[in-house]
Amino acid sequence: MFQTTAELRSAFLKYFEDNGHQVVDSSSLVPTNDPTLLFTNAGMNQFKDVFLGMDKRNYTRATTSQRCVRAGGKHNDLDNVGYTARHHTFFEMLGNFSFGDYFKEDAIRFAWTFLTETLKLPKERLCVTIYETDDEAYDLWTQKIGVPAENMIRIGDNKGGAFASDNFWQMGDTGPCGPCSEIFYDHGDHIWGGRPGTPEEDGDRFIEIWNIVFMQYNRQADGEMLPLPKPSVDTGMGIERIAAIMQGVHSNYEIDIFKQLIAKTAEIIGVTDLENKSLRVIADHIRSCAFLIADGVMPSNEGRGYVLRRIIRRAVRHGNKLGANDAFFYKLVPTLISVMGDAAIGLKQTQAIVEKALKAEEEQFARTLERGLVILDGALNSLQGDTLDGDTLFKLYDTYGFPVDLTADVCRERDINVDEAGFESAMAEQRSRAQAAGNFGADYNSQLIIDAETAFSGYTELTGQPNVIALYVDGKAVDTVKAGQDAVVVLDNTPFYAESGGQVGDKGLLTADGVVFTVADTQKFGPATGHQGQLAQGQLVIGQQLTAQVDKKLRHRTQLNHSVTHLLHAALRQVLGSHVSQKGSLVNPERLRFDFAHFEAVKPSELKAVEDLVNTQIRRNHELCTAEMAIDEAKEKGAMALFGEKYDDQVRVVTMGDFSIELCGGTHVGRTGDIGLFKITSENGIAAGVRRIEAVTGIAAMAYIAEQQAMLDEAAQLLKSDSASVVVKLKAQLDKVKQLEKDLSQLKDKLAAAASADMAGDAVEINGVKLLVKQLDGIDPGSLRGLQDELKQKLKSAIIVLGTAKDGKVNLIAGVSNDLTKKVKAGELVAMVAQHVGGKGGGRPDMAQAGGTQPENLAAALALVEPWVNERLS
């Protein structure tokens, strides 16, 4: 009998393969054909275009085990995960599909036969729901399959509108739709709950295990239901639910996959209570996090990356709650790969990347988690009422990186609500402040709405004879532009490239007889192109013909930098891994800047490998080929689409040999050899999970290398060495400096000891206690600690306060022998003195330090020590 999750997966796919279905691999968790979806959340997602008639496959029957994530957006199960028996962020959906092949009778028969004959589920434990008016399905279930009428349940429009029902599926407001049949399993009367359609249906006794959707209508905009010419079938069965039934347990968290993950988590953290809900949360979250990273999503502050970050941080918080002191989450990946079997092949290939990304994110969050929890705990302990205010929510989010749902999770455990509306208000205020701070002047051009279209000829031409079709001055449409005025000129066609995809807009000239307009920038305004600049001489009018001339040198240098970003992107993916994806770029004539997803600093050896790889491709002198094609065709060819970019149905594909293929509308060199040379100038992090490389090409790269060589030569001269020996000579000098610093420190200690011998005699006695207060002008502040220690040893039982002023700053130290700390505390004493010199400080009862900014008040401040001590000793 099939019992393990892996056995069930294999049995399902084999059953449908034996019945003429094509086994199709699970698609990525990042949807490639549906921009409306955050994550793949159903088996039919990858077949959406097939159902819509926009795509054709070489098969009409398919079966899959699809990885799915529901966290964020419309389908968000995150809040319930760990607290219920069946909510997950990650799950596998078993499914079979018919694209105009079989319909209701076969779909029903396939499902029933698999459940009752292959899995041998008791028929009396199964009941079926159908849409209220779907008599065809009712007859098939009762007459063909033999389900008793008492186990058939009709469900009507129970969601407030026509065809708004649990048993009527719709892709959207219009398009394919149809009734569905759901098969439920009865876990037994020892569990509370009622059959579907009853008031107790939300209980856990009757659990839906299989949904069979009959796509038989095409819903029109006016609501009319027209029959589809080729009805189709979409089914889904959660593998975790059927595994629970086959393994004789009620909760999904008791099945083999979760039992092993929970046990491993408990072992790593050192927990003995395996029923703890935090273990369930962690076991669920490692699945979604690991598979999302394997599919190219990296933790970030936006979009899919932010949802991933929220899930990781929720898991880390629950680990902290269980007592985890060190990074633990990433250590679950090997166990996950083991328990997922064939479903983890892609995860196994990216295991190292997944573990590094999880560890980096966990360690980063751990640094602020403890402090944030202290703030939250304090706020909850002092809370008046049962709702945490929005300002505190915002502070935790803004300062400590606590997603709102993580804070809500903590509050939920204490039966406390959260003021999400107040949080959103605080967020809105911050956005307004940021916008106001950045708004140094009105940008009228950004507000332009231009009802015109400009054709682009700049891929092949840098000159043209366009006509003026619109003029704007100070954001307003005008008929004429006069000399000296700044303006936006709109042409019917142009060789000027408008800023897009990270490439800056072209510069150049628009001229005619007696007319010179200097183009300082070129921008898009919808389908129109605006040439921004100043009219140097003459007059511009609508309808006027001009000569457009792009600055050839600037365009050429920009093209070098744009083409090399494609090579850089491909090289980074080869050296660092396929998880690397572009997050932003800037390409101008001087340099290029490339932002990309990666979880740690790039090692010098990796940077060198990337640079060498790019220069190798430059030397190979690949021809740059461009082609227009359908976006789906481009993706099939392996073209990289940049996340966040919007593409038309027809796209431009730029290919460089067999090394790089990307969707790109920018301008490029003819061959990679034109780039000449590529040199990385810097690499650094700009956000969690996002790195930035800056680089130069061509003549700029040669100039950079010459500049570096000049600095090396100068350093060699200073070290009286040749360039090749600079590192060795510099290391020797640094070693010498370290030794001198050590000698100096020892000398200071000796001087402090000698000085302490002289000063010890200056101590006064107050109520039987020795007190020494000294202002030491000119002494190095770093020597105060050693001097104070020496004086303590000599005076044995004493109170010591030393102060020095240097470079406009005051440094103070107070020392109290241990036998006196119950009466006089060094921290309180030094804080009292510091407040009189414009500073503050504190420390332990026996030793404390402080600083100040008013050296002119130091003597008077030290004079206050004796009466202060006298008061505490009396």
From Swiss-Prot:
SUPFAM superfamilies: Class II aaRS and biotin synthetases (SSF55681), Putative anticodon-binding domain of alanyl-tRNA synthetase (AlaRS) (SSF101353), ThrRS/AlaRS common domain (SSF55186), Translation proteins (SSF50447). Its EC number is 6.1.1.7. Binds 1 zinc ion per subunit. Zn(2+) binds at H562, H566, C664, H668. GO terms for molecular function: alanine-tRNA ligase activity; aminoacyl-tRNA deacylase activity; ATP binding; tRNA binding; zinc ion binding. CDD domains: AlaRS_core (cd00673). It is found in: Cytoplasm. Pfam families: DHHA1 (PF02272), tRNA-synt_2c (PF01411), tRNA_SAD (PF07973). Keywords: Aminoacyl-tRNA synthetase, ATP-binding, Cytoplasm, Ligase, Metal-binding, Nucleotide-binding, Protein biosynthesis, RNA-binding, tRNA-binding, Zinc. GO terms for cellular component: cytosol. Its cofactor is Zn(2+). Its main location: cytoplasm. GO terms for biological process: alanyl-tRNA aminoacylation; negative regulation of DNA-templated transcription. The keyword ATP-binding applies. Catalyzes the attachment of alanine to tRNA(Ala) in a two-step reaction: alanine is first activated by ATP to form Ala-AMP and then transferred to the acceptor end of tRNA(Ala). Also edits incorrectly charged Ser-tRNA(Ala) and Gly-tRNA(Ala) via its editing domain. Consists of three domains; the N-terminal catalytic domain, the editing domain and the C-terminal C-Ala domain. The editing domain removes incorrectly charged amino acids, while the C-Ala domain, along with tRNA(Ala), serves as a bridge to cooperatively bring together the editing and aminoacylation centers thus stimulating deacylation of misacylated tRNAs. Belongs to the class-II aminoacyl-tRNA synthetase family. This is Alanine--tRNA ligase. It comes from Shewanella frigidimarina (strain NCIMB 400). The lineage of its organism: Bacteria, Pseudomonadati, Pseudomonadota, Gammaproteobacteria, Alteromonadales.
